[in-house]
């Protein structure tokens, strides 16, 4: 009986030593993977602000939502670049139509084509 208990004790000690050396047993619980908080910390508020979980109900706002862009006032300098480009294109087109109607573009057709610097050097 003493021989059996000694063999059992030896096998338990061997198993404990092997599991500790192989890294199968860890003394502290390790946290792994991404959580919403860690993603928000690393990616910034814009990445997390657009996140909605399945538990969100329509019509209710959360604390983490971004400020809506409806607060922008007309004529403010916060306009996006494509909107400014569209407005600039429309203004240039209307200016072109006004010059064409006034006859200012007819005089430009009578002028010779502008020569490049290479053409001037050759002649």
UniProtKB/Swiss-Prot annotation:
Keywords per UniProt: Cleavage on pair of basic residues, Disease variant, Epilepsy, Hormone, Neuropeptide, Phosphoprotein, Secreted, Signal
Alphabetized SMART domains for the sequence: Galanin (SM00071)
Gene Ontology annotations of biological process type: feeding behavior; insulin secretion; negative regulation of lymphocyte proliferation; nervous system development; neuropeptide signaling pathway; parental behavior; positive regulation of apoptotic process; positive regulation of cortisol secretion
Residue span(s) of the pro-peptide: 20-30
GO cellular component: extracellular region; extracellular space; neuronal cell body; secretory granule
Extent of Basic and acidic residues compositional bias: 62-73
GO molecular function: galanin receptor activity; galanin receptor binding; neuropeptide hormone activity; type 1 galanin receptor binding; type 2 galanin receptor binding; type 3 galanin receptor binding
Pfam families, alphabetized: Galanin, GMAP
Keyword match Cell inner membrane: no
Residues in the signal sequence: 1-19
Modified residues (Phosphoserine): 116-117
Residue ranges, annotated region (Disordered): 46-80
Subcellular location: Secreted
Keyword flag Signal: yes
InterPro entries: Galanin, Galanin_pre, GMAP
Disease note: Epilepsy, familial temporal lobe, 8: A focal form of epilepsy characterized by recurrent seizures that arise from foci within the temporal lobe. Seizures are usually accompanied by sensory symptoms, most often auditory in nature.
Family classification: Belongs to the galanin family.
Function summary: Endocrine hormone of the central and peripheral nervous systems that binds and activates the G protein-coupled receptors GALR1, GALR2, and GALR3. This small neuropeptide may regulate diverse physiologic functions including contraction of smooth muscle of the gastrointestinal and genitourinary tract, growth hormone and insulin release and adrenal secretion.
Name listed for the protein in its UniProt record: Galanin peptides
Source organism per UniProt: Homo sapiens
């Amino acid at each position: 009986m003493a021989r059996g208990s000694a063999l059992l004790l030896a096998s338990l000690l061997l198993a404990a030593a092997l599991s500790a050396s192989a890294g199968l047993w860890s003394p502290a619980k390790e946290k792994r993977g991404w959580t919403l908080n860690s993603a928000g910390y690393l990616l910034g508020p814009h990445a997390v602000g657009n996140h909605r979980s399945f538990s969100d109900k329509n019509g209710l706002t959360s604390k983490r939502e971004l400020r809506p862009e409806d607060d922008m006032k007309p004529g403010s300098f916060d306009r996006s670049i494509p909107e400014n480009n569209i407005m600039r294109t429309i203004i240039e087109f209307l200016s072109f139509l006004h010059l064409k109607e006034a006859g200012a573009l007819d005089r430009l057709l009578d002028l010779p084509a502008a020569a490049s610097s290479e053409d001037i050097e050759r002649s």
